[in-house]
Design a protein with these regions (language model features):
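Short, structured segments at the rim of ligand-binding sites
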Residues: 1-95, 99-519
Length: 519
């Protein structure tokens, strides 16, 4: 496994481009199972989860390939660490050179006049179904990510049968698939769960009126699944309490490009007129609002000055207004924003809600920022109330916080200290990276395979902004010197003889110590 070694305390400055959204790309790729013809997708992010979805779709009879060969800098998600631009070959040299003028963006002259010079874009992805015989999505692939469940709807609608393992993903709380099954059953599917798999059959689905509200709001993947299946159903389907997230809208727009008839996208009420077939189409995946929010918080936590390209500002209204309420300066121009910190930030209370509220996928990153803002702040998660597994790691970097139910109470401090920390899930890994960027000294973030699932080459974007960050193999020899602790550093404890007291039976006079002179 790999880990990040980060030298904190550097201001992020520069310009980077936001990649395509993971939470849109995965259900869109799954929906290609229902297409009759080739599909061309652009701006699909280079993620471990995309690789997993690719393997899953190939196992279900789909041909997937990148149209143009490309090997952008840092295209690999793991492997040997590149030498630093300033010539350092080891972490100690890199740390010492972290403030050199040649490393990272050294001046503001080129930061804000033109779009990001190295967008790290992946080539277009071409997907086409070549064999419809296989309908089993096996456990070995599905267990790796929760979005694998999105193949259930298109498989059932197109092939009339499906067998999909119950999904995996990050351990962030209870996320049942009952609403998926409820929606598909309403369309006429015959469903059962047996041996850890969902077994589904239907000759042809039929339109129905479906309510998809749950205990904590609408279901995003459930809406994607049922909406995709309903496009090939006979008649009209009405979905109430549908998820309104931009990623659901992007999937709906993609399905409409393939010939579907979906109206009401972006509202809780969807109307879907069933069609006989979906044809191939071309689509550009929308920008990742969670990656954008993470980098906005990275700029704020380092008192930086960062421009982010390829932004849909209408998807980030809650994030922008929350940061402005803390004292962060945000300038908007076109499809880009500039995030700056020009003074002290203020603590605040925030609640994570379904879209258009503050996204739960930014809860951990927001906590990282609030840990560096002196004063009391409170974060409440109304979407996943148990999504606080990362809280235990914050004490390692000197943060003061405690959890109470669905809330975390944070007593912010101006200075975090570098430490070795371990990620528990995808967004927690990003939050720990942000904390390490702000901390004094060196930090190590372990289990970054979580981060590779949802962030497109994040370390290269942070390097472009001037961060001192290296990916290396997780081994004790690769720890920076500042985090290698030895018992020799502990001085022996000296206790004056006058403070030493004998056992009670000696003090009572029952026995007497005899010195050599007395003998």
């Amino acid at each position: 496994m790999d880990m990040f070694v980060i030298h904190g305390g550097r201001r992020l400055r520069g310009r980077v481009r936001i990649s395509g959204a993971k939470n849109a790309a995965l259900p869109i790729m799954a929906a290609c199972l229902a297409a009759d013809g080739p599909v061309r997708l652009r701006d699909v992010p280079a993620l471990a989860d995309v690789d997993t979805m690719t393997q899953l779709l190939e196992s279900l009879g789909m041909s997937i390939r990148h149209e143009l060969p490309a090997d952008p800098p840092g295209a690999g998600l793991s492997g040997p660490v590149e030498e630093c631009e300033c010539g350092a070959e080891s972490w100690d040299e890199f740390s010492a050179a972290a403030h050199c003028a040649d490393h990272g963006p050294g001046s503001a002259a080129v930061l804000f006049d033109s779009p990001a010079a190295n967008p790290l874009q992946t080539p277009p992805l071409r997907l086409e179904v070549v064999d419809e015989a296989e309908c089993v999505a096996h456990y070995d692939l599905v267990r790796r990510m929760r979005a694998s469940i999105c193949v259930l709807g298109p498989l059932l609608a197109r092939r009339g049968r499906a067998c999909v393992s119950l999904p995996g993903g990050c351990a962030i709380g209870d996320r049942p698939v009952d609403l998926h099954l409820k929606g598909l059953a309403a369309l006429g599917a015959d469903l059962k769960i047996e041996r850890g798999y969902i077994w589904a059959r239907a000759r042809r689905l039929k339109g129905a009126r479906i309510y998809l509200g749950g205990a904590f709001g609408s279901t995003v993947t459930g809406t994607c699944n049922v909406m995709t299946a309903a496009t090939l159903a006979e008649g009209t389907t009405h979905i109430e309490a549908a998820a309104c997230e931009p990623e659901v809208v992007d999937l709906g727009n993609f399905l409409n490009r393939m010939g579907a008839r979906i109206s009401g996208l972006g509202t809780p009420f969807l109307q879907i007129e069933g069609v006989d077939r979906l044809v191939g189409a071309e689509h550009v995946v929308l920008p990742d609002r969670i990656e954008a929010g993470t980098l906005m918080l990275a700029a704020a936590i380092t008192n930086g000055d960062v421009v982010l390209d390829n932004i849909r500002l209408e998807h980030l209204t809650a994030v922008v207004e929350t940061l402005r309420g803390m004292g962060v300066t945000i300038e908007e121009f076109g499809e880009a924003i500039r995030v700056m910190v020009r003074g002290d930030l203020r603590p605040l209370d925030c609640i994570m809600l379904p879209y258009p509220g503050l996204p739960t996928d930014l809860q951990a990153q927001m906590m990282a920022l609030l840990c560096t803002v002196p004063g009391i702040s409170i974060i409440t998660d109304k979407v996943f109330p148990d999504r606080f597994m990362h809280v235990a790691e914050w004490c390692r970097v000197g943060a003061s916080r405690r959890r109470e139910g669905a809330s975390a109470i944070i007593n912010g401090t101006a200075h975090l200290s570098g430490a070795s920390v371990m990620a528990s899930d995808l967004r927690a890994s990003a939050a720990l990276v942000l904390a390490a960027l702000a901390a004094r000294g060196d930090s190590v973030v372990r289990r970054i395979y979580h981060l590779d699932r949802g962030y497109d080459r994040l370390e290269y974007k942070l390097k472009d902004l001037g961060a001192a960050i290296l990916r290396t193999v997780d081994h004790p020899h690769n720890l920076p010197a500042g985090l290698q602790v030895s018992s020799q550093e502990l001085p022996p404890q000296e206790v004056p003889g006058s403070e030493l007291r004998g056992p009670k039976w000696l003090r009572r006079g029952d026995f007497k110590l005899v010195t050599p002179e007395e003998e």
